[in-house]
């Protein structure tokens, strides 16, 4: 009879341990799920910021091309006005 009681007692202890481990496992699973959601949210935010950066870089390239075009146009106009001024000066000297 003592052996049966010991077996029942051991079974109860193992059941209690199993319940505790199940509870710990559930808590850890919940924490993992929370962290997973946090990381997914962080990744979404990073993706949004990367897209904003890519868009800004594209806009910057477009603006730089326009600046270069305007610089070239400005240079052309300066040369043209310089030639015109020089022609007027030459006509006055003649």
UniProtKB/Swiss-Prot annotation:
It comes from the Viruses. Residues 1-22 are annotated as: Disordered. Residues 1-77 form a coiled coil. Keywords: Coiled coil. This is Uncharacterized protein 042R. It comes from Invertebrate iridescent virus 6. The lineage of its organism: Viruses, Varidnaviria, Bamfordvirae, Nucleocytoviricota, Megaviricetes.
